[in-house]
Amino acid sequence: MRSAVIVTMLVVVALAALLTQGQDLKYQEREMVAELAQQIYRVAQAPWAGAVGPHKRNSELINSILGLPKVMNDAGRR
């Protein structure tokens, strides 16, 4: 119980920090942060459920694969 409260507080602090910097994030970075926050929340609610891993739909997998060249190109410009 104590660990769940601590993890929840850490998530709240992390999200508060991200919300103050959220305007600087690109759409893909925001999506990544949201997915990470969902995973942390799932682990805090039910630690045994997080071990299974996130399940993506086929459309999400296809979109992420199709978006790889753009992400790699953007990363190369930095």
UniProtKB/Swiss-Prot annotation:
One of its GO terms (cellular component) is extracellular region. Expressed in eyestalk tissue and cerebral ganglia. It is found in: Secreted. Keywords: Amidation, Cleavage on pair of basic residues, Hormone, Neurotransmitter, Secreted, Signal. Pfam families: Pigment_DH. The keyword Secreted applies. GO terms for biological process: chemical synaptic transmission; response to light stimulus. Residues 1-22 form the signal peptide. GO terms for molecular function: hormone activity. Its main location: secreted. The modification Alanine amide is found at A75. InterPro entries: Pigment_DH. Belongs to the arthropod PDH family. The pigment-dispersing hormone causes the migration of the distal retinal pigment into the proximal end of the pigment chromatophore cells and thus decreases the amount of light entering the retinulas. May also function as a neurotransmitter and/or neuromodulator. This is Pigment-dispersing hormone peptides.
